[in-house]
Amino acid sequence: MRYTFSDEKKATTTTTSRAKSQARLLNSASYRRAARTTLRHSYGMGMWRAVALLACLSATHAALFTEGGAVQNGKDNKANKYVEFAHDDKINKEDLLKYYGKEVEQYKDDDSYMEYLIEYMKSHPVPAQFPNFEQEAEQEHQDELNQWLEQLMNEQELLEPANAAVKDAEQKAPLAPVHHKQVAQKPAQEPFDLDDLLRGELMLENEIAKESELKKTQEKLSEQTPSAKANVESLESAMQTATGEPQVPQKKGQNEFVSFVEQEPQPAKQTISSQTVDKRRLATSAEYSGSAPRYSSSSLLLLAVGTVMCVGLIGTVAGGTYYYKNNRRTETPDDGEYAPYAGTGPGFRKNKGNKGDETLAYKAQLHQYQQAKQKIICGEDAPGIIESDGEDGADEENNYSVYECPGLAPTGDIEVCNPNFAAQP
């Protein structure tokens, strides 16, 4: 009961505190200012309606009275015009589909379709051929030739009265003396032939084209580098020194005419061979000098860098191998270390040539081991001598360096006292 009463009391206190805080807020100046500044509900809804009306009015004004609107320059029904166009297009499309659909149904068969094509071709004339530009160029050239021939004929007609006057004057002139020879009169000129004129013009055009090509080649030769000119001059001078005659430029066919008319005396075979050898030597030397490899600075630099890199690589490999071997020698123990301290070790065994001492020492150790073993097995107090094998006996017959010591005490009388172990358990 105590707990429920206390809870109810706490709830009443919280509600009273909340009511007091709300009353304070309502009476505060900040709440009053906020109430004054905010719009009423009805007033705000009216403003939104006014804004919506203004937007509608502006849209209608833009649709009617602007450049793209319906009412501009007396076009009152422009807005409905596009609808009419769309409707007309729809009607036309339907009509075309109906017409072409029927037409296709009518001419499904091959024979009927061929008849339809023939009728269509008869009703529609064949269009004119496309222009042929090559034929037009030939026609223009022919027209120019005809004009040129007409001009020539007109000039001849104009010159005919002058020629007639000259002939009349010659006839009226006194006769020439007898000792003068009569000059043969020229035959009358035949009329011009168009084919001959065309051939002559073609020949002239070919000659003009050849001359232009020759000029181009001469210009290219003149534009060659000075090194090529120097090589040509050196070759000409070499040929001049070899033959003894200056190299003069000759016309086409001049060399053949001179060799045919003025036959030079042929020298002996030895002289011919010597001259040809000299010429060949000069030509080959000039050719080799012109075709010798010329290294640029970049290629020389690349060669130098490559050689330096190769030498460095070889040096590093050689140094690495030498260092590796030397380091291993220092790390591994030397075989000669064992020799100065004792007669054992690998150095002693390698350096010693006589093996007699080794065999003797080995046999002595073996003999001692066998004696100790026999004593342990038999349990004898006195030291007994055990005979070795036949081979050992045969080897020890002549061996007097190893002797048995008889003055040693027997091993059974010796007592060993170890302080770590108790005498009695």
UniProtKB/Swiss-Prot annotation:
One of its GO terms (biological process) is ventral cord development. Keywords: Membrane, Transmembrane, Transmembrane helix. The chain crosses the membrane at residues 300-320. It is a single-pass membrane protein. Expressed in a variety of neurons. Residues 205-424 are annotated as: AEX-3-binding. Binds to the RAB3 GDP/GTP exchange factor aex-3. This is Protein cab-1. The gene is cab-1.
